[in-house]
Curated annotation (Swiss-Prot):
Subcellular location: Nucleus
Example GO molecular function: DNA-binding transcription activator activity, RNA polymerase II-specific
GO CC, alphabetical: nucleus
Protein name: Grainyhead-like protein 1 homolog
Length: 618
């Protein structure tokens, strides 16, 4: 008896869903297979299936074909000596309801898929506890059942020693350890009330050839139930029905490694001190309860940005950013930068500078990611008034999941910062430590953190509001070259495979979201760029500032002529000597794009009534 069951392999016949229209329904297995007999399974058909690598399917289909070609009377008489199974008592067995679905079997639909001992994980709906007896019945809501479909021929068939398993369930990250020899089928359409003994119809009709058989395990002995005992179908699933793991909104943790203030008021956010332009590590990781479980789509997209801590309107925020940008020595100065450290780039990918105050990147939640961020603006840089308190700033991180297609982040957290210049963060910490040591414990009204217990790791505080859109700052002069309004939400899964993919348009508010006439904005983009050069003669120590009216070679000649009294019409050639010693003819392109705010030493040579000018780069 045991040898007979050793030759059994699970074969699952799946319906073809909506690929073919339903033609007719059959009331018995014999009637269904009569249509198959009209289209014989020839040797050529078996050969084609074998060539395509589906030898097991060809063998299973041939077995079923030979079985139903025998008349029903002869089949019943010959089957009795082999296996004798009395009609089971349904009151004593666990009954699984029959899903009343019409099979889609016809001459053109003979598709058989052989599952080689593949373990499936079934997650039954949570509901009422299933009261079951001791005969291997379902005892908890999350239960496994074993399904066997067809008996393979007695000749040897190559099987795997270690079957490959995959999980089907909601969510996939939930893992239920099961023995490798169990085969479990998941049916999303089953409810808890269907798993009662009364759910089985008294006269359940026989299923068509794609019916399944059930096997249970009783003290190590395999017990087989045939179609009259159990019939379980796996429904067809469209691509829209596949449910991937959705990253929940509270299972991320971000930490900033920087000095924290010693004076923390109860209820207030932790204040972290940073130095302007210094890079600090930020660690991102998932802290879900199911540690060690790898997600099917594990990549997420995070946006790290510098925003104002106070609740301000978008117009006020943009006005402050514009004022800060106008006071910078170069138009390319950004509010936030990311370092290209090897430690960081081994854990993140697809880095995009989506705005002057925001950087986005992709990372895998199965691993810990680390980025190094610097903030280039002080809290006092947003106002022209002296002696006023600076605006509080936050480092905010929004994380978007590739598993949903919503523009709303799945997680948002922030950390309040105060930025100092010239190592001011360390001086501020020393001042607080000195004041703390001088203050008597009895006079302390605000709780202070002892210096020896002070932690240098700040955990970002989760933000409940996920609907408010942060403002991204992109100056007008760079709209033409920068990806405008670029957002981090993945639209297609193809981005997972390519590094540096172009991001899609998203909902973040940028400067072009406000009521500005398009024609006026276009005019600002096309305004000529001003070029400033610092020039001195060889005998001088102080540089002269040459502001070119037009960023061209003609504008450079006019500026030199006005500054050094060189006749404009007698200037012949202008050369640029690079630091490498290369002598290059100056043209409009070099003046416009490669000379702004550069320092030069000017050489003026007169020969034959004309002047040759050489700008030596310093």
């Amino acid at each position: 008896m045991t040898q007979e069951y050793d030759n059994k392999r699970p074969v699952l016949v799946l319906q073809n869903e909506a690929l073919y229209p339903q033609r007719r329904s059959y009331t018995s297995e014999d009637e269904a297979w009569k249509s198959f007999l009209e289209n014989p399974l020839t040797a050529a058909t078996k050969a084609m299936m074998s060539i395509n690598g589906d030898e097991d399917s060809a063998a299973a289909l041939g077995l079923l074909y030979d079985y139903y070609k025998v008349p029903r009377e002869r089949r019943s008489s010959t089957a009795k000596p082999e296996v004798e199974h009395p009609e089971p008592d349904h009151s004593k067995r666990n009954s699984i309801p029959i899903v009343t679905e019409q099979p889609l079997i016809s001459a053109g639909e003979n598709r058989v898929q052989v599952l080689k001992n593949v373990p499936f994980n079934i997650v039954l709906p949570h509901g009422n506890q299933l009261g079951i007896d001791k005969r291997g019945h379902l005892t908890v809501p999350d239960t496994t059942v074993t399904v066997s479909i067809a008996t393979m021929p007695t000749h040897s068939i190559k099987t795997e020693t270690q079957p490959h398993g995959f999980t089907v369930g909601i969510p996939p990250a939930v893992y239920h350890p099961e023995p490798t020899e169990r085969v479990v089928v998941f049916d999303r359409n089953l409810s808890t009330d269907q798993f009662s003994s009364g759910a089985q119809a008294p006269n359940a009709q026989r299923r068509t050839p794609d019916s399944t058989f059930s096997e249970t395990f009783k003290e190590g002995v395999q017990e087989v139930f045939f179609p009259s005992d159990l019939s379980l179908r796996m429904p067809g699933m469209n691509s829209e029905d596949y449910v991937f793991d959705s990253v929940s909104g509270n299972n991320f943790e971000y930490t900033l490694e920087a000095s924290k203030s010693l004076r923390q008021k109860p209820g207030d956010s932790t204040m972290t001190y940073l130095n302007k332009g210094q890079f600090y590590p930020i660690t991102l990781k998932e802290v879900s309860s199911n540690e060690g479980i790898h997600h099917p789509i594990s990549k997420v997209r995070s946006v790290t940005m510098v925003v104002f801590a106070e609740d301000k309107s978008r117009e006020d925020q943009l006005r402050h950013w514009k004022y800060w940008h106008s006071r910078q020595h170069t138009a390319k100065q950004r509010c936030i930068d990311i370092a290209d450290y090897k430690e960081s780039f081994n854990t993140i990918s697809n880095i995009e500078e989506i705005a002057y105050n925001a950087i986005s990147f992709t990372w895998d939640i199965n691993d810990e990611a680390k980025v190094f961020i610097s903030v280039n603006c002080l809290s006092t840089d947003f106002s022209s008034q002296k002696g006023v308190k600076g605006l509080p700033l936050n480092i905010q991180i929004d994380t978007y999941s590739y598993n949903n297609r919503s523009n709303k982040p799945v997680h948002r957290a922030y950390c309040q910062i105060k930025v100092f210049c010239d190592k001011g963060a360390e001086r501020k910490i020393r001042d607080e430590e000195r004041k703390q040591s001088k203050r008597k414990v009895s006079d302390v009204k605000v709780p202070l953190l002892p210096s020896h217990k002070r932690m240098d790791i700040t955990v970002f505080k989760p933000f409940i509001d996920l609907d408010t859109q942060p403002v991204l700052f992109i100056p007008d002069v760079h709209f033409a070259s920068l990806q405008r309004g670029t957002h981090v939400l993945p639209i297609a899964s193809e981005e997972l495979e390519g590094e540096g993919s172009v991001l899609k348009r998203g909902p973040y508010s940028t400067e072009d979201d406000f009521a500005v006439p398009p024609s006026a904005k276009l005019a600002r983009i096309e305004e000529p760029k001003r070029v400033l050069l610092y020039v001195r003669k060889e005998s001088e120590e102080v540089f002269d500032a040459l502001m070119l009216k037009t960023p061209s070679l003609k504008g450079l000649m006019e500026a030199i002529s006005d500054k050094y009294d060189v006749p404009h019409d007698k200037i012949g050639k202008i050369f640029k000597k690079c630091k490498k010693g290369i002598l290059v003819n100056m043209d409009d392109n070099i003046v416009k794009h490669y000379s702004n705010e550069d320092t030069f030493q000017l050489q003026i040579e007169e020969a034959g009534g004309s002047y040759k000018l050489t700008l030596i780069e310093i």
